């Protein structure tokens, strides 16, 4: 099946396989029955294809076979992803001893000034055995581990053991269980020799790179070897807002660069083609091990392997069939890739380059030199193909993405190849390796500078509808736009060439093109007008005199208090990117006082967003090494850090804050929720009528709330930050004493905990406390009303 010169014969089977995987991974219990049914249909269609030899029947048969393979893979793999022994432990809340092998490097980047430490951020691993009581069961289950990081840097493939509790993930998730470690991890054994070799290379290269100044040194490990640990939240946000995030980590295109170098160098010295191909395959395997098997790298490696074996067999290859075959093979190996955004974006970007780069180059060449047109067409093709999916991750369209990519992309191969050579040279010839790393730093710095510059420009992105509506709307507009401007059509390109496409007519009717252009422009104009109007209206309605702001950062707390030109941030939420977005939206560049109520991930996970921006931090009692590492990071970034307890006080502008909990001696209270720092902000005499008073309860449970009340009274306040995201574990007396006008709840939409609970909401209602919650209302801004005790509430969204 060909259209306009494009070889589409395997594209539809790949799409069908993708849909089958995406559907069946969500209902794995039905996989055996559906697999049998699909294979029954496949057998019938194959028989008809042989008998009739009709093209559409052959395509249908291939689609059924591809779907059958993926369905069978789901049926075979699903039980191992969520074995009964782990499901039982999760349901019963039992403590288990878990043995896992790590899937990523753990430990701190010592050379980075403000890099994320190991702390409480989760990491991916594979559970290999579980001990429940005296029973030990071998398993092979992908998990996401919270806590349980060893003190020393630990490479990929190391085996760790620790006690934990489990929570089953949704069947379609990329992991089978969430693992919550109850103690520190013990290293049982190191990685296998191949992974240990790669870990050593990555560690030495990251150390050498991050010793270099600026963002270039932090970006280079990701560009060359896929190590993104040094990329801070500000640089990460800049790369994303300019459509350069694919350069944050190693690109799948690097596989093609590596193979091309091997083949060309081998040909130059007269190495036979067969030997060159075998050498290329071996180098390809080593490259994947070194940079880690990220989805884009694996996709590119499989495509490269297909091309190499086809070349060895003397068979011609074309881009789209190779891409489709690689996608089918990978989905058959791991059907859960069908729900992996990275894999989807990698396939879409490659498809966009194969289908659109040629026509776009020819179109742009009418107005600019051909070479410049080609440079612009490549990122434009990739962005057009990927953007409908990208809006699911970030509902906005980067307006400078194409220009930023055109400027940054030429530097990427230089940074990658030179950096990779430096990585390999460091162990044998450190002086040569360090020289190459320094040279690779130059193009990496250029890429970082491009991202930072364009991210700082006004209107760097256009807001877009969220979810499926946004995807469909953008896909329709993109398709109509392509129909309108690409009147010359497309032809499939040879993988061995540029991948350009061109040739026959795709849309020859001028009338159709004009209608497509008109509809696309009408949709864009209508949406842009509505969006711009809504945004202007929202900005005009937003109170400039806000004193308390609750950021919408998902399931967690991040609340700002503003007084007298000074800013306090109480907790940071779970995600640096979401916190950065909130701070930027409110124009907050500096934090005078950071309060970390306790060290759970939903309260400190976003701390990397403010490292280097905090003057003073106050924290509660540490629960272990990971908490101490966060404190050390804050100190290294220039903050003065104090552990506080009941009775400590301080000033923030025209507010005096008092610590009400924990006590200096914890007694039976363990670090964590029940040792949360509880803070009251009260106006000084000069601002008695113009400043909001507030009470922040952290995640304090009912028992600790009662102990706090027993330690001394609390004053009535205007605003209370509700404890523990609205859980049922609350003391009614605290809210009676607080007499708050507004209760703020930091909570994630559709969270798995049932927060906020009906009991808490009823409790607040009984006290006459109005509820402002971030899951339904987004950003919440509070400012003083006209009368004493009156609070004006502005929310980003109206509650349903």
Report the location of each language-model feature:
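Hydrophobic alpha-helical transmembrane segments in multi-pass membrane proteins
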Residues: 232-401, 466-540, 621, 730-732, ...
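C-terminal region of N-terminal signal peptides and the immediate post-cleavage residues
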Residues: 26-31, 68-91, 337-338, 525-549
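N-terminal leader/targeting segments
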Residues: 1-86, 205
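Membrane-interface helix/helix-cap signal primarily in integral membrane proteins
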Residues: 1-6, 61-246, 581, 590-592, ...
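Alpha-helical transmembrane segments of multi-pass integral membrane proteins
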Residues: 353-459, 739-746
């Amino acid at each position: 099946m060909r259209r306009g010169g494009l070889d589409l014969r395997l594209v539809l089977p790949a799409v069908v396989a993708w849909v089958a995987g995406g559907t069946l991974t969500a209902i794995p219990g039905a996989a055996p029955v559906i697999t049998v049914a699909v294979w029954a249909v496949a057998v019938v269609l194959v028989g008809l294809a042989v008998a009739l030899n009709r093209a559409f029947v052959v395509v249908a048969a291939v689609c059924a076979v591809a779907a059958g393979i993926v369905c069978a893979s789901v049926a075979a793999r699903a039980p191992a992803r969520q074995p009964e022994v782990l499901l039982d432990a999760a349901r019963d809340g039992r403590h288990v001893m878990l043995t896992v092998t790590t899937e990523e490097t753990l430990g701190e980047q010592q050379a980075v000034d403000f890099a994320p430490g190991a702390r409480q951020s989760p990491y991916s691993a594979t559970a290999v055995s579980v001990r429940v009581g005296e029973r030990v069961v071998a398993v092979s289950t992908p998990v996401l581990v919270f806590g349980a990081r060893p003190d020393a840097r630990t490479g990929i493939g190391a085996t760790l053991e620790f006690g934990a509790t489990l929570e089953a993930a949704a069947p379609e998730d990329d992991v089978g269980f969430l693992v919550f470690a109850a103690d520190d991890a013990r290293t049982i054994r190191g990685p296998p020799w191949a992974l240990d070799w790669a870990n050593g290379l990555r560690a030495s290269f990251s150390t050498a790179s991050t010793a270099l100044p600026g963002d270039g040194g932090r970006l280079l490990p990701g560009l060359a070897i896929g190590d993104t640990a040094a990329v801070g939240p500000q640089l990460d946000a800049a790369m994303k807002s300019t459509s350069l995030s694919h350069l944050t980590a190693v690109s799948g295109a690097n596989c093609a660069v590596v193979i091309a170098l091997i083949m060309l160098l081998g040909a130059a010295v007269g190495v036979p083609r067969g030997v060159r191909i075998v050498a290329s395959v071996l180098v390809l395997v080593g490259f994947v091990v070194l940079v880690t098997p990220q989805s884009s790298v694996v996709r590119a490696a499989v495509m490269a392997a297909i091309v190499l074996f086809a070349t060895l067999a003397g068979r011609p290859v074309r881009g789209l069939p190779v891409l489709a075959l690689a996608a089918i093979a990978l989905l058959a190996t791991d059907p859960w890739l069908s729900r992996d955004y990275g894999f989807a974006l990698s396939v879409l970007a490659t498809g966009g380059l194969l289908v659109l780069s040629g026509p776009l180059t020819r179109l742009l060449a009418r107005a600019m030199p051909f070479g410049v047109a080609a440079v612009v067409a490549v990122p434009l093709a990739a962005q057009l193909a990927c953007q409908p999916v990208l809006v699911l991750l970030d509902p906005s369209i980067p307006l400078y993405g194409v220009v930023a990519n055109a400027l940054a992309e030429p530097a990427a191969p230089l940074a990658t190849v030179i950096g990779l050579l430096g990585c390999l040279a460091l162990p044998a010839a450190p002086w040569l390796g360090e020289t190459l790393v320094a040279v690779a730093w130059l193009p990496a710095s250029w890429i970082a500078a491009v991202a930072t510059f364009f991210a700082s420009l006004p209107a760097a992105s256009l807001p877009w509808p969220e979810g499926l509506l946004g995807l469909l709307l953008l896909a329709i507009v993109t398709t109509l736009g392509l129909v309108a401007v690409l009147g010359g059509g497309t032809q499939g390109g040879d993988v061995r060439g540029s991948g350009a496409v061109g040739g026959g007519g795709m849309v020859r009717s001028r009338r159709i093109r004009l209608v497509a252009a008109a509809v696309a422009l009408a949709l864009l104009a209508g949406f842009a007008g509505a969006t711009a109007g809504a945004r202007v209206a929202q900005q005009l309605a937003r109170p400039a005199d806000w004193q308390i702001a609750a950021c919408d950062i998902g399931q967690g707390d991040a609340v700002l208090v503003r007084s007298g030109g000074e800013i306090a941030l109480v907790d940071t939420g779970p995600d640096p990117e979401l916190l950065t977005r909130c701070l930027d939206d409110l124009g907050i560049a500096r934090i005078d006082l950071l309060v970390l109520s306790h060290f759970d991930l939903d309260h400190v996970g976003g701390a990397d967003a403010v490292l280097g921006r905090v003057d003073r931090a106050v924290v509660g009692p540490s629960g272990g090494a990971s908490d101490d590492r966060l404190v050390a990071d804050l100190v290294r970034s220039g903050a003065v850090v104090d552990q506080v307890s009941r009775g400590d006080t301080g000033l923030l502008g025209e507010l005096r804050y008092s610590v009400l909990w924990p006590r200096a001696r914890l007694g039976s209270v363990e670090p964590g929720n029940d040792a949360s720092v509880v803070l009251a902000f009260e106006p000084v005499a000069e601002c008695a009528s113009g400043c909001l008073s507030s009470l922040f309860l952290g995640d304090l449970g009912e028992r600790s709330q009662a102990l706090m009340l027993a330690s001394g009274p609390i004053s009535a306040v205007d605003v209370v930050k509700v404890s523990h995201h609205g859980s049922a574990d609350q003391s009614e007396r605290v809210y009676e004493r607080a007499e708050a006008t507004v209760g703020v709840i930091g909570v994630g939409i559709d969270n798995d905990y049932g927060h906020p609970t009906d009991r808490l909401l009823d409790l607040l209602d009984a006290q006459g406390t109005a509820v402002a919650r971030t899951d339904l209302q987004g950003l919440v801004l509070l400012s003083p009303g006209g009368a004493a005790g009156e609070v004006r509430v502005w929310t980003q969204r109206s509650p349903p």
